[in-house]
Amino acid sequence: MYKRQGIAEADTEYGPVRGFLLRNIYSFRGIPYGDDTGGKNRFMPPQPPHAWQEIRPAVAFGASSPQPFYDRRPESYSMFVDHWNYDLMGEDCLRLNIWTPGLADGKRRPVLVWLHGGGFTQGNGIEQDSYDGENIARYGDIVFCSVNHRLGALGFSDLAGAGGEKYRHSGNAGMLDIVAAVKWIQANIANFGGDPSNVTVMGQSGGGSKVCLLCAMPAAKGLFHKAVALSGNTVKANNADYAERLGNAILHEAGLDTSQVDSLQSVPWEQYLELANRARQRMAAEDPG
Protein backbone atom coordinates (compact mmCIF):
# COMPACT_ATOMS: atom_id res chain seq x y z
CA MET A 1 0.00 0.00 0.00
CA TYR A 2 1.36 3.41 -0.99
CA LYS A 3 0.56 6.62 0.87
CA ARG A 4 3.65 8.81 0.47
CA GLN A 5 3.44 12.35 -0.89
CA GLY A 6 2.30 12.51 -4.50
CA ILE A 7 0.67 9.08 -4.42
CA ALA A 8 -3.14 8.81 -4.55
CA GLU A 9 -3.74 12.54 -4.48
CA ALA A 10 -6.57 14.33 -6.28
CA ASP A 11 -8.08 17.79 -6.32
CA THR A 12 -11.73 18.56 -5.54
CA GLU A 13 -13.52 21.89 -5.76
CA TYR A 14 -13.27 22.17 -1.96
CA GLY A 15 -9.65 21.11 -1.51
CA PRO A 16 -7.13 18.32 -2.22
CA VAL A 17 -7.51 14.79 -0.84
CA ARG A 18 -5.11 11.90 -0.37
CA GLY A 19 -6.32 8.31 -0.41
CA PHE A 20 -4.21 5.21 -0.88
CA LEU A 21 -3.10 2.83 -3.62
CA LEU A 22 -3.66 -0.87 -2.96
CA ARG A 23 -3.35 -3.65 -5.53
CA ASN A 24 -3.26 -1.02 -8.29
CA ILE A 25 -6.60 0.54 -7.31
CA TYR A 26 -6.79 4.03 -5.84
CA SER A 27 -9.19 4.30 -2.91
CA PHE A 28 -10.57 7.48 -1.39
CA ARG A 29 -12.76 7.12 1.68
CA GLY A 30 -15.00 9.52 3.53
CA ILE A 31 -14.74 12.55 1.22
CA PRO A 32 -17.23 15.21 2.40
CA TYR A 33 -19.74 16.29 -0.22
CA GLY A 34 -21.82 18.29 2.27
CA ASP A 35 -21.61 20.03 5.62
CA ASP A 36 -22.48 18.56 9.01
CA THR A 37 -26.27 18.04 9.08
CA GLY A 38 -26.61 18.61 12.82
CA GLY A 39 -27.80 21.71 14.66
CA LYS A 40 -29.13 24.47 12.42
CA ASN A 41 -28.65 22.22 9.37
CA ARG A 42 -30.93 19.49 10.70
CA PHE A 43 -34.00 19.01 8.45
CA MET A 44 -32.52 21.51 5.98
CA PRO A 45 -31.32 20.86 2.40
CA PRO A 46 -27.66 19.80 2.35
CA GLN A 47 -25.13 22.61 2.51
CA PRO A 48 -21.72 22.58 0.77
CA PRO A 49 -18.78 21.38 2.85
CA HIS A 50 -16.31 23.90 4.21
CA ALA A 51 -13.29 24.24 1.93
CA TRP A 52 -9.82 23.23 3.11
CA GLN A 53 -6.31 24.18 2.01
CA GLU A 54 -4.07 21.37 3.24
CA ILE A 55 -4.28 17.88 1.76
CA ARG A 56 -7.12 16.11 3.53
CA PRO A 57 -6.69 12.41 4.41
CA ALA A 58 -9.32 10.26 2.70
CA VAL A 59 -8.42 6.88 4.17
CA ALA A 60 -11.28 6.22 6.63
CA PHE A 61 -14.97 5.72 5.86
CA GLY A 62 -17.18 8.54 7.07
CA ALA A 63 -19.88 8.30 9.70
CA SER A 64 -23.13 6.52 8.94
CA SER A 65 -26.35 8.46 9.33
CA PRO A 66 -27.88 7.98 12.79
CA GLN A 67 -30.18 4.96 12.69
CA PRO A 68 -31.50 2.08 14.81
CA PHE A 69 -28.79 -0.48 15.42
CA TYR A 70 -29.60 -4.17 15.69
CA ASP A 71 -26.97 -6.49 17.11
CA ARG A 72 -26.61 -9.35 14.64
CA ARG A 73 -23.57 -10.94 16.24
CA PRO A 74 -25.42 -13.92 17.77
CA GLU A 75 -26.78 -14.84 14.33
CA SER A 76 -23.81 -16.66 12.84
CA TYR A 77 -25.25 -17.36 9.40
CA SER A 78 -26.65 -13.85 9.11
CA MET A 79 -23.21 -12.46 9.89
CA PHE A 80 -21.65 -14.79 7.29
CA VAL A 81 -24.00 -13.63 4.52
CA ASP A 82 -24.36 -9.98 5.54
CA HIS A 83 -21.28 -8.60 7.26
CA TRP A 84 -22.81 -5.33 8.42
CA ASN A 85 -20.34 -2.50 9.00
CA TYR A 86 -21.89 0.41 10.90
CA ASP A 87 -18.83 1.90 12.61
CA LEU A 88 -19.33 5.52 13.71
CA MET A 89 -22.80 7.08 13.52
CA GLY A 90 -23.39 10.82 13.55
CA GLU A 91 -24.98 13.73 11.74
CA ASP A 92 -21.73 14.69 10.00
CA CYS A 93 -22.48 11.88 7.56
CA LEU A 94 -22.52 13.41 4.07
CA ARG A 95 -19.53 11.44 2.82
CA LEU A 96 -18.73 9.43 -0.28
CA ASN A 97 -16.13 6.85 -1.26
CA ILE A 98 -14.35 6.41 -4.59
CA TRP A 99 -12.40 3.52 -6.11
CA THR A 100 -10.63 4.07 -9.42
CA PRO A 101 -8.00 2.29 -11.53
CA GLY A 102 -6.28 5.53 -12.53
CA LEU A 103 -5.74 9.20 -11.76
CA ALA A 104 -4.80 11.81 -14.36
CA ASP A 105 -3.96 9.09 -16.88
CA GLY A 106 -5.99 10.61 -19.70
CA LYS A 107 -8.77 8.00 -19.52
CA ARG A 108 -12.44 8.85 -19.06
CA ARG A 109 -13.96 5.83 -17.36
CA PRO A 110 -17.65 5.10 -16.82
CA VAL A 111 -18.84 6.11 -13.35
CA LEU A 112 -21.11 3.89 -11.22
CA VAL A 113 -22.79 5.46 -8.19
CA TRP A 114 -24.01 2.85 -5.69
CA LEU A 115 -26.99 3.59 -3.41
CA HIS A 116 -27.28 1.24 -0.46
CA GLY A 117 -30.39 -0.58 0.70
CA GLY A 118 -32.04 -0.46 4.09
CA GLY A 119 -35.50 0.88 3.36
CA PHE A 120 -34.58 4.58 3.85
CA THR A 121 -33.99 3.93 7.56
CA GLN A 122 -30.77 1.90 7.76
CA GLY A 123 -27.49 1.22 6.01
CA ASN A 124 -24.46 3.03 4.66
CA GLY A 125 -22.21 3.00 1.63
CA ILE A 126 -19.95 0.26 2.99
CA GLU A 127 -22.33 -1.71 5.23
CA GLN A 128 -21.62 -4.98 3.43
CA ASP A 129 -18.25 -6.27 2.27
CA SER A 130 -19.62 -6.59 -1.26
CA TYR A 131 -20.03 -2.80 -1.36
CA ASP A 132 -16.25 -2.38 -1.41
CA GLY A 133 -15.53 -1.08 -4.90
CA GLU A 134 -11.99 -2.38 -5.40
CA ASN A 135 -12.79 -5.40 -7.55
CA ILE A 136 -15.51 -3.85 -9.71
CA ALA A 137 -13.23 -0.87 -10.38
CA ARG A 138 -10.43 -3.23 -11.39
CA TYR A 139 -12.31 -5.74 -13.53
CA GLY A 140 -14.77 -3.27 -15.02
CA ASP A 141 -12.22 -0.48 -15.51
CA ILE A 142 -14.75 1.92 -14.00
CA VAL A 143 -14.88 4.51 -11.25
CA PHE A 144 -17.08 3.22 -8.43
CA CYS A 145 -18.64 5.57 -5.86
CA SER A 146 -20.73 4.83 -2.78
CA VAL A 147 -22.67 7.36 -0.74
CA ASN A 148 -23.79 7.98 2.84
CA HIS A 149 -26.83 10.22 3.33
CA ARG A 150 -29.43 11.06 5.97
CA LEU A 151 -31.86 8.29 6.85
CA GLY A 152 -35.07 7.73 8.75
CA ALA A 153 -36.55 10.52 10.83
CA LEU A 154 -33.51 12.77 10.35
CA GLY A 155 -33.76 12.53 6.59
CA PHE A 156 -37.50 12.30 6.05
CA SER A 157 -39.46 14.21 8.74
CA ASP A 158 -42.01 16.51 7.11
CA LEU A 159 -42.21 19.47 9.48
CA ALA A 160 -43.49 21.97 6.92
CA GLY A 161 -47.04 21.80 8.26
CA ALA A 162 -45.85 23.17 11.58
CA GLY A 163 -42.71 25.05 10.60
CA GLY A 164 -43.78 26.60 7.32
CA GLU A 165 -41.53 27.59 4.43
CA LYS A 166 -38.28 27.13 6.35
CA TYR A 167 -39.01 23.41 6.63
CA ARG A 168 -40.52 22.80 3.22
CA HIS A 169 -37.72 20.41 2.22
CA SER A 170 -37.52 18.57 5.55
CA GLY A 171 -39.56 15.60 4.34
CA ASN A 172 -37.15 14.97 1.49
CA ALA A 173 -33.76 15.94 2.95
CA GLY A 174 -32.29 12.46 2.55
CA MET A 175 -33.02 12.37 -1.18
CA LEU A 176 -31.66 15.90 -1.58
CA ASP A 177 -28.44 14.61 0.00
CA ILE A 178 -28.16 12.05 -2.80
CA VAL A 179 -28.75 14.77 -5.40
CA ALA A 180 -25.95 16.79 -3.79
CA ALA A 181 -23.65 13.75 -3.92
CA VAL A 182 -24.28 13.21 -7.63
CA LYS A 183 -23.73 16.94 -8.25
CA TRP A 184 -20.39 16.63 -6.46
CA ILE A 185 -19.53 13.65 -8.64
CA GLN A 186 -20.41 15.62 -11.76
CA ALA A 187 -18.12 18.46 -10.70
CA ASN A 188 -15.16 16.43 -9.47
CA ILE A 189 -15.07 12.91 -10.85
CA ALA A 190 -12.90 13.80 -13.85
CA ASN A 191 -10.06 14.34 -11.36
CA PHE A 192 -10.49 10.71 -10.32
CA GLY A 193 -10.32 9.27 -13.83
CA GLY A 194 -14.10 9.30 -14.37
CA ASP A 195 -16.29 10.55 -17.19
CA PRO A 196 -18.99 12.96 -15.94
CA SER A 197 -20.91 12.40 -19.17
CA ASN A 198 -21.25 8.67 -18.44
CA VAL A 199 -22.70 8.31 -14.94
CA THR A 200 -24.95 5.42 -13.87
CA VAL A 201 -26.88 5.37 -10.59
CA MET A 202 -27.56 1.91 -9.22
CA GLY A 203 -29.08 0.58 -6.02
CA GLN A 204 -30.49 -2.51 -4.37
CA SER A 205 -33.72 -2.86 -2.35
CA GLY A 206 -34.21 0.55 -0.71
CA GLY A 207 -31.37 1.74 -2.91
CA GLY A 208 -33.35 0.66 -5.95
CA SER A 209 -36.25 2.77 -4.72
CA LYS A 210 -33.88 5.72 -4.34
CA VAL A 211 -32.81 5.24 -7.96
CA CYS A 212 -36.46 5.40 -9.08
CA LEU A 213 -37.05 8.54 -7.03
CA LEU A 214 -33.96 10.19 -8.50
CA CYS A 215 -35.35 9.52 -11.97
CA ALA A 216 -38.48 11.46 -10.99
CA MET A 217 -36.76 14.40 -9.29
CA PRO A 218 -36.38 17.58 -11.35
CA ALA A 219 -33.37 18.52 -9.20
CA ALA A 220 -31.52 15.43 -10.46
CA LYS A 221 -32.18 16.04 -14.16
CA GLY A 222 -29.00 15.82 -16.21
CA LEU A 223 -26.83 14.59 -13.34
CA PHE A 224 -26.77 10.96 -14.50
CA HIS A 225 -27.37 9.12 -17.74
CA LYS A 226 -28.37 5.55 -16.84
CA ALA A 227 -30.18 3.98 -13.92
CA VAL A 228 -30.38 0.43 -12.54
CA ALA A 229 -32.91 -0.44 -9.81
CA LEU A 230 -32.29 -3.87 -8.26
CA SER A 231 -35.09 -5.57 -6.27
CA GLY A 232 -36.70 -2.31 -5.31
CA ASN A 233 -38.85 0.33 -6.92
CA THR A 234 -41.00 3.23 -5.79
CA VAL A 235 -44.13 4.67 -7.33
CA LYS A 236 -45.36 6.43 -4.18
CA ALA A 237 -44.21 6.51 -0.58
CA ASN A 238 -46.24 8.08 2.21
CA ASN A 239 -48.70 10.69 1.00
CA ALA A 240 -48.38 14.34 1.97
CA ASP A 241 -51.23 14.20 4.49
CA TYR A 242 -49.67 11.28 6.40
CA ALA A 243 -46.23 12.90 6.35
CA GLU A 244 -47.59 16.17 7.74
CA ARG A 245 -49.58 14.40 10.45
CA LEU A 246 -46.49 12.44 11.46
CA GLY A 247 -44.46 15.64 11.71
CA ASN A 248 -47.11 17.14 13.98
CA ALA A 249 -47.18 13.93 16.03
CA ILE A 250 -43.42 14.18 16.58
CA LEU A 251 -43.87 17.72 17.89
CA HIS A 252 -46.64 16.51 20.21
CA GLU A 253 -44.46 13.64 21.44
CA ALA A 254 -41.71 16.15 22.25
CA GLY A 255 -44.17 18.33 24.20
CA LEU A 256 -43.77 21.23 21.77
CA ASP A 257 -46.24 23.38 19.87
CA THR A 258 -45.96 24.66 16.31
CA SER A 259 -44.12 27.80 17.43
CA GLN A 260 -41.31 25.65 18.83
CA VAL A 261 -40.33 23.59 15.79
CA ASP A 262 -36.79 25.00 15.84
CA SER A 263 -36.27 23.35 19.23
CA LEU A 264 -36.17 19.98 17.46
CA GLN A 265 -32.86 21.01 15.88
CA SER A 266 -31.16 20.96 19.28
CA VAL A 267 -32.56 17.65 20.54
CA PRO A 268 -29.81 14.97 20.64
CA TRP A 269 -30.25 12.75 17.61
CA GLU A 270 -30.69 9.62 19.74
CA GLN A 271 -33.59 11.28 21.53
CA TYR A 272 -35.09 12.58 18.29
CA LEU A 273 -35.10 9.12 16.70
CA GLU A 274 -36.89 7.78 19.78
CA LEU A 275 -39.46 10.59 19.65
CA ALA A 276 -40.15 9.89 15.99
CA ASN A 277 -40.48 6.17 16.62
CA ARG A 278 -42.98 6.70 19.44
CA ALA A 279 -44.98 9.13 17.28
CA ARG A 280 -45.12 6.61 14.43
CA GLN A 281 -46.23 3.83 16.77
CA ARG A 282 -48.93 6.03 18.32
CA MET A 283 -50.28 6.98 14.89
CA ALA A 284 -50.38 3.33 13.86
CA ALA A 285 -52.29 2.41 17.02
CA GLU A 286 -54.80 5.22 16.50
CA ASP A 287 -55.31 4.45 12.82
CA PRO A 288 -54.33 0.81 12.12
CA GLY A 289 -55.76 1.02 8.59
Range-by-range predicted roles:
Residues 100-107, 187-195, 218-221:
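Surface-exposed acidic, glycine-flexible loop patches that form ligand/cofactor-binding
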Residues 192-204:
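Alpha/beta-hydrolase fold nucleophile elbow
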